[in-house]
UniProtKB/Swiss-Prot annotation:
The active site is at D66. Its EC number is 5.4.99.25. Could be responsible for synthesis of pseudouridine from uracil-55 in the psi GC loop of transfer RNAs. PANTHER family: CENTROMERE/MICROTUBULE BINDING PROTEIN CBF5, H_ACA RIBONUCLEOPROTEIN COMPLEX SUBUNIT DKC1. This is Probable tRNA pseudouridine synthase B. The keyword Isomerase applies. Keywords: Isomerase, tRNA processing. It is an enzyme of class 5 (isomerase). Belongs to the pseudouridine synthase TruB family. Type 2 subfamily.
Amino acid sequence: MELIVKEESKTDYNYGSDPYNRDIKTLLNTGLVVIDKPSGPTSHEVAAWVRNMLNLVKAGHGGTLDPKVTGALPVALGNTTKCVPIWHIPPKEYVCLMHLHDDAELVDIENIFKEFTGRIHQRPPLKAAVKRSLRIRKIYEIEILEIDGRDILFRTKCQSGTYLRKLVDDMGEALGTSAHMQELRRTISGPFYENEAVYLQDLLDAYIFWKEDGNEEELRKIVKPLEYGLQHLKKIIIKDSAVDAVCHGATLYSSGISKIEKGLGTDEVVLIETLKGEAVAVGKPLMNTKDMLKTEEGEVVEITRVIMEPGIYPRIWKKRNKNDKSKPELKKK
């Protein structure tokens, strides 16, 4: 990541904090955990167990896995639930065991796998909790790892919302043998990886260790700040004076920017951060990095989702009358 300075600015440490230095209670309400989901429970049940385990008001998972499916299941804690839709932007990766119902030649299997790379059409299965309309999904990568008789182990990286069970059914039909999904494990879920996932028991042990012995070390290894789950987004760093206005949903103006990540385009989601590295909001850039650096005034990012609660940073903008349609203004010092 390369940040380009638009205007040097300092931050006031009387407000906000470094995300990785938050006290443990704040971290539990603005953090996330990546659970290694076991076979059996639903994703909703796992999220509910985490919520109850950590004595939280709310928690939500970042991508449904069927009960029998295992692997990386990110769980948002407390106020981090508002970040869940952002986790669906990057691709997801799975390792799948596919069983053919008849014998097939290796060359035919390889050709079918190539055929199902790229844009595919899918209709959600009957049990899906969404409307069964035809949709387009992208298979970025699909690789055969091992073939043992009629069993095919493969890895695939695909767009969020792809139904792997349906993919296997469709490939089996195209192959002429029919097939079904025997096992499935998610290895990557957006910005989260299988090797950082923990068992539910590990989370419980770490929480009890903190509550009973006051030792936060193990819990801090497992619970990450919400910013950890947004590291895949390009960034704009804003001045302290602009933070509270953005927290109230105001459009970001050029005058509020301190630094911009190189290569930012208008076709992506951008993360707006404080000078301390705290996530403030995400939005749609109205111009690219080059134009943002040149412009001295005007709107540069349309806010689509506010993450930080208002009031953490001081308000340095004029409150408008409800009938006033003009733009918010910074208070003159």
